[in-house]
From Swiss-Prot:
Belongs to the UppP family. It catalyses: di-trans,octa-cis-undecaprenyl diphosphate + H2O = di-trans,octa-cis-undecaprenyl phosphate + phosphate + H(+). The chain crosses the membrane at residues 1-21, 39-59, 83-103, 111-131, 144-164, 189-209, 218-238, 246-266. Bacitracin is thought to be involved in the inhibition of peptidoglycan synthesis by sequestering undecaprenyl diphosphate, thereby reducing the pool of lipid carrier available. InterPro entries: UppP (IPR003824). One of its GO terms (biological process) is cell wall organization. It is a multi-pass membrane protein. Keywords: Antibiotic resistance, Cell inner membrane, Cell membrane, Cell shape, Cell wall biogenesis/degradation, Hydrolase, Membrane, Peptidoglycan synthesis, Transmembrane, Transmembrane helix. This is Undecaprenyl-diphosphatase. Pfam families: BacA. Catalyzes the dephosphorylation of undecaprenyl diphosphate (UPP). Confers resistance to bacitracin.
């Protein structure tokens, strides 16, 4: 992998990981459209490290508060709203872990195609638009009980299908349940911390046992670029949705989906 490819793929990963437009789709497309080789396990781990660092550092106050409340609930019986939210985030992570382990081979074999990406990009974009326009948008993330957390967790599990978008699915589910746009995004971002950690750890274990070559320069490029782009993305996304809602991302998904269909039909 060249430094240019590493830079571009890390930039794409960072900007799309937390937007409702599917990071996996944008990482699959370069190989499908431009003929780039697969970036490999080591690079996957690197960009996971970068995006994880971005969300943890951006929400560092919330992360510290949630961790403190979680351990307080375990050892001291803390029943604060922060402790409840921490447990709900853990609950919401479980479905994706189960689905990921059970369905990953099927997804790899049958669903990582540009046709699937184009279809899911359009369908879930329209669903996001409908929910954003028709939901009550009144609750914050601390209103998430176990039923709501499980529902959002199931939506996150569905995002194993390329083109769906993890953040898109979870934000859509949270909006449907009555969360405000900002609360839906925050809950989605906080949910990303355990799932990115687990996914990165799983890929790291595979890397250790695979014997794949490691190029330090491209890996550092991946970490740094994905971190910076993800941090910037989180900051401006939260500001944008409070003013414009989800419409810009729906429009982008529709353009991407139909554009990809047009490209595929011309091949």
């Amino acid at each position: 992998m060249s430094y240019f490819e590493a830079f571009m793929l890390a930039l794409v990963q960072g900007f799309t990981e937390f937007l409702p437009i599917s990071s996996s789709a944008h990482l699959i497309l370069p190989s499908a459209v431009l003929g780039w080789e697969d970036q490999g396990l080591a690079f996957d781990v690197a960009v996971h490290v970068g995006t994880l660092a971005a969300v943890v550092i951006y929400f560092r106050k919330e992360v510290v508060s949630l961790l403190s409340a979680f351990f307080g609930s375990v050892f001291k019986g803390d029943r604060s709203k922060e402790a409840k939210l921490a447990w709900m985030i853990i609950l919401a992570t479980i479905p994706a872990c189960i689905f990921g382990l059970l369905m990953k081979d099927i997804v790899e074999l049958y669903l990582r195609s540009a046709w699937v990406i184009a279809t899911t990009t359009i369908i879930f974009g329209l669903l996001l638009w409908w929910v954003d326009k028709n939901s009550s948008l009144r609750d914050d993330e601390y209103q998430a009980g176990w039923k709501k957390a499980l529902f959002i967790g199931l939506a996150q599990a569905m995002a194993i299908i390329p083109g769906t978008s993890r953040s898109g699915a979870t934000i859509t589910a949270a909006l449907y349940l009555g969360f405000t746009r900002e609360a839906a995004a925050r809950f989605s971002f906080l949910m990303s911390i355990p799932i990115i950690t687990l996914a990165g750890g799983y890929l790291g274990l595979k890397l250790v046992t695979s014997g794949d070559p490691i190029h330090v320069g491209t890996l550092l490029t991946g970490i740094v670029v994905s971190f910076i782009s993800a941090y910037i993305c989180i900051h401006f996304f939260l500001k944008l949705i409070s003013r414009m809602g989800m419409t810009p991302f729906v429009i982008y998904r529709l353009i991407l989906g139909f554009g990809l269909f047009a490209f595929l039909m011309m091949q």
